[in-house]
Amino acid sequence: LYAPSAGIVCPFHLNIALAENANANGVEFKFDMEVTDLKKTGEIWEVHTNQGVFETKYVVNAAGVYADKFHNMVSEKKIHITPRRGDYCLLDKSAGNHVSHTIFALPGKYGKGILITPTVHGNLLLGPTAIDIEDKEGTNTTREGLDQVIAGANLNVKNIPMRQVI
């Protein structure tokens, strides 16, 4: 699929910039704390942590694969997040001009499929897979996953210089 309105960003730099902007606008971040309970009194949230209780008007659930635990503290409707691992291949900058825009596969029930995209730094990125896993901490890469990335990318773009994988 060709999506002319699609854009390419560096997710790391984007999130740092968003956090810096939020901080400049009064957001206070609390790191390395476990939220043990949440209670709402009127318009104020009490956030109980392993390092004390904090009061705030707004709470942002940015817990990633643990967002279900956080959500379930405050919602009657319980959810469960099944973690999913994605394998990628990152190619050297010398391969970055192999495509000039993001090429999307047809999405399936397990995700958007394998894409081929240049990065903002000039590399070429292929992936991801979307494999359900049990371990929320599971970040390992598998040979099978990398083979799936390569096969999926080759369906949409020919002659990808796979010797340039870094």
What are these regions (language model features)?
Residues 1-2, 98:
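Long, low-complexity, intrinsically disordered polar/charged segments
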Residues 2-58, 66:
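Helical element adjacent to the flavin cofactor pocket in flavoenzyme catalytic cores
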Residues 37, 53, 63-166:
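Active-site substrate-recognition segment that forms the wall
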